[in-house]
């Protein structure tokens, strides 16, 4: 058996695949798994009780995680004039207007989040086919279309993230690094869950948090009891 196979078998022996755990227990399971040579990301995958085909059941928003994600973001800002100068001063990694639009049209997407001033959206909107599938398109709902670029950049640096349900009604979000202590991971997950519940469409019927799984990059996916999360 390969080292990879032995590691997976060892992981599976630490918990019951058919069981749902409390959030604290699930985090403990991830922490107990064999280590790897890099700091793994803690991801959550949430199946929502929505019909994503309906325009009034789209789930998208943002939340400031109390302990950040542990990831150093590469922030791009579409802006011109004074707002571009403000973005540069605030520490954005890439700042520009038409030049960045053309660069992205050519296939460059070497950044993690994009912010735009409202006056830039006419041109930025032309990048929908490139940015949309990568969840990089600035939107007012996510707070990434703004006149206050300084505040937005600061919030992103501190741990503000965007979440969006895909075509299957699933939200996949990185919420922490496995090196965070258990309480920090738990508080970040709870903040995300509270934001998801707040974003529940009024027309969504039945159970909203259908399935919730937490995992690490090289670790298992552990099912979390949604009854605990709904009560947050």
Swiss-Prot record:
Part of the 50S ribosomal subunit. GO terms for cellular component: large ribosomal subunit. PANTHER family: 54S RIBOSOMAL PROTEIN L1, MITOCHONDRIAL (PTHR36427), LARGE RIBOSOMAL SUBUNIT PROTEIN UL1M (PTHR36427:SF3). The lineage of its organism: Bacteria, Pseudomonadati, Chlamydiota, Chlamydiia, Chlamydiales. Gene3D superfamilies: 3.30.190.20, 3.40.50.790. GO terms for biological process: regulation of translation; translation. Binds directly to 23S rRNA. The L1 stalk is quite mobile in the ribosome, and is involved in E site tRNA release. Protein L1 is also a translational repressor protein, it controls the translation of the L11 operon by binding to its mRNA. It comes from the Bacteria. Keywords: Repressor, Ribonucleoprotein, Ribosomal protein, RNA-binding, rRNA-binding, Translation regulation, tRNA-binding. Belongs to the universal ribosomal protein uL1 family. This is Large ribosomal subunit protein uL1. GO terms for molecular function: rRNA binding; structural constituent of ribosome; tRNA binding.
């Amino acid at each position: 058996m390969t080292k990879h196979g032995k590691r997976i078998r060892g992981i599976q022996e630490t918990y019951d695949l058919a069981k749902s755990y409390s959030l604290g227990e699930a985090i403990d399971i991830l922490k107990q798994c064999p280590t790897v040579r890099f700091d793994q990301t803690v991801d959550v995958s949430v199946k929502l009780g929505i019909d994503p085909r309906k325009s009034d059941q789209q789930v998208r928003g943002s939340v400031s995680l109390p302990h950040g994600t542990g990831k150093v973001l590469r922030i791009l800002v579409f802006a011109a004039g004074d707002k571009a100068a403000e973005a540069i001063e605030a520490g954005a990694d890439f700042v520009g207007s038409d030049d960045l639009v053309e660069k992205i049209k050519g296939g460059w997407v070497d950044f993690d989040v994009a912010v735009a001033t409202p006056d830039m959206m006419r041109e930025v909107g032309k990048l929908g086919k490139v940015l949309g599938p990568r969840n990089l398109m600035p939107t007012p709902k996510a707070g990434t279309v703004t006149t206050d670029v300084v505040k937005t950049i600061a919030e992103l640096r501190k741990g503000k993230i965007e979440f969006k349900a895909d075509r299957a009604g699933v939200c996949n979000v990185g919420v922490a690094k496995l090196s965070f202590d258990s309480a920090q991971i738990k508080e970040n997950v709870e903040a995300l869950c509270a934001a998801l519940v707040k974003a529940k469409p009024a027309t969504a019927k039945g159970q909203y948090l259908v399935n919730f799984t937490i995992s690490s990059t090289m670790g298992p996916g552990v099912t979390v009891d949604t009854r605990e999360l709904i009560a947050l």
